[in-house]
Every structure is written in structure tokens, then in C-alpha cells.
């Protein structure tokens, strides 16, 4: 993992791919973390939130800027991101219950009480960064089974090494009975919001852009939503 200093904090990269923008003061990162934080504001999960893959806690600065005090349960096999977060953002540590563990093992041990589960895992491979294979097969049904009634899953997806992923995205959507997808002008990522209690795509898009404008994130005008 390569760590570089930025104007507002730190940047974590692997093979030249930015994994996380760790901002140390409340505000936008202008990255995928802004969308994930804005979704928490828009979806307003009333109870437990889980995050698979911590990546330095990049969501915390935009969450703070949006006035969200929600505590999250986070799990990751790599301790470096957590240690950087504790060192550079000590006042936000109380907002995160972090555990070093395999995501599947940890999730299997949890009760079905999550109102929101965010899958944000990544692995380096051949000079690039991809999603682990469990994102496409093991995790979707497991995440579905750990959601409370009306719970929602959010996947931060990347193209697989083969580059063909439409069928994989559609399969995840079917697992949850429906989904909305967010694509980006600036990133190859696709964020999938899956569940049975999601607003219609036009309504969700309007609310998400409003939250991003409030955050002053450049992503407010660079996202595109559709039904998956």
C-alpha cells in the first residue's frame, strides 16, 4: 500500500489505483466515498450499519460533513487502514467498531439485524485492483440473509479481469429482488443499491444529487442512475 499526503489528509493507493482518500477534516473526498456517505444520508437506515472493507475510513469525513453521527461496524483483513485512521482521525474513532477478520467469516457470525450493509472489498492482482471473487458469488446471498426486514445492501463494484460484468451485476440484483445502479463519469466503478425498499430511480437520483450538492462534492453532477 502506498501512502501519500494530500491537501486535506492522506491518499491510499495500490498499483497506482486510489483505494481511499482519508480526509482528516469534515468535507468531500470527491471520490466513491462521497456517494456511499450520501447514500447513508438518503436511505436513513434506522439501525445497524456494516461495512465490509474499511480502506482507511474514507467515508467518515463526508459523513461528518453531512451531519451524520451513525456508528458503523467495519471489518477488514488489512490493519494498516485502521491504524492510519486511528492516528490521523482520533476524534472519529468512537464512530467505528473495527475488527480484523475475514469478511465472510465475520458476517456468518452476525445476526440478521443490519439495516444497511456496504460491500467495499478490493484485492490487488497483476498490477491492478479488482473485486475478490466472493463479491460475485458468496457474498450476495450471505449479505441478503444478514439484513433486517427492509434492509438494503450497497456494493461498490469494479469490472472483473475479463471486463464483462453485466450478467454478474444483474445476478446480484436478482438475489435481492431488485436494485438501482450508479455509474460515474470519473470512475469505472459501479455502485449497486439492492433491496426491496429502494425508492424509484428518479426519486433516488434526485435525493442522492441533493445530498452530494450539500456535501459540495464534485460527484453531484457526474453520476448516472438506472434500474439494474
Where are these predicted regions, by residue range?
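SAM/dcSAM-binding transferase cores
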Residues: 1-7, 11-31, 38-42, 185-228
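Short, histidine-centered active-site or binding-site loop motifs used for metal coordination
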Residues: 16-18, 121-125, 157
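The AdoMet/dcAdoMet-binding core of the Class I SAM-like
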Residues: 25-146, 150, 162-163, 169, ...
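A generic structural signal for alpha->beta connector loops
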Residues: 69-71, 93-95, 150, 176-178, ...
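A SAM-dependent methyltransferase catalytic signature shared across enzymes that methylate proteins
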Residues: 127, 168-182, 195-199
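Conserved beta-strand signature within the Rossmann-like core of class I S-adenosyl-L-methionine
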Residues: 150-157
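Short, glycine/charged-rich beta-strand-loop motifs at protein surfaces that mediate ligand recognition
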Residues: 158-159, 180
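Short Gly/Pro-enriched loop/turn and capping motifs at secondary-structure junctions
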Residues: 160-162, 198-199
Amino acid at each position: 500500500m502506498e501512502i501519500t499526503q494530500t491537501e486535506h489528509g492522506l491518499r491510499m493507493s495500490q498499483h497506482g489505483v486510489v483505494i481511499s482518500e482519508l480526509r482528516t477534516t469534515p468535507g468531500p473526498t470527491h471520490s466513491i466515498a462521497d456517494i456511499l456517505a450520501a447514500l447513508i444520508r438518503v436511505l436513513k437506515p434506522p439501525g445497524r450499519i456494516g461495512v465490509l472493507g474499511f480502506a482507511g475510513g474514507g467515508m467518515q469525513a463526508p459523513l461528518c460533513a453531512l451531519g451524520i453521527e451513525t456508528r458503523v461496524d467495519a471489518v477488514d483483513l488489512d490493519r494498516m487502514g485502521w491504524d492510519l485512521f486511528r492516528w490521523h482521525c482520533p476524534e472519529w474513532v468512537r464512530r467505528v467498531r473495527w475488527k480484523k477478520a475475514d469478511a465472510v467469516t465475520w458476517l456468518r457470525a452476525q445476526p440478521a439485524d443490519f439495516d444497511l450493509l456496504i460491500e467495499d472489498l478490493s484485492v490487488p492482482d497483476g498490477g491492478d485492483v479488482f473485486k475478490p471473487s466472493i463479491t460475485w458469488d458468496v457474498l450476495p446471498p450471505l449479505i441478503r440473509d444478514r439484513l433486517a426486514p427492509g434492509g438494503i445492501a450497497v456494493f461498490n463494484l469494479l469490472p472483473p479481469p475479463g471486463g464483462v460484468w453485466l450478467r454478474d451485476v444483474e445476478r446480484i440484483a436478482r438475489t435481492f429482488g431488485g436494485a438501482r445502479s450508479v455509474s460515474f463519469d470519473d470512475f469505472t466503478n459501479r455502485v449497486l443499491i439492492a433491496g426491496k425498499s429502494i425508492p424509484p430511480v428518479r426519486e433516488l437520483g434526485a435525493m442522492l444529487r441533493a445530498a452530494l450538492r450539500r456535501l459540495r462534492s464534485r460527484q453531484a453532477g457526474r453520476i448516472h442512475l438506472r434500474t439494474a
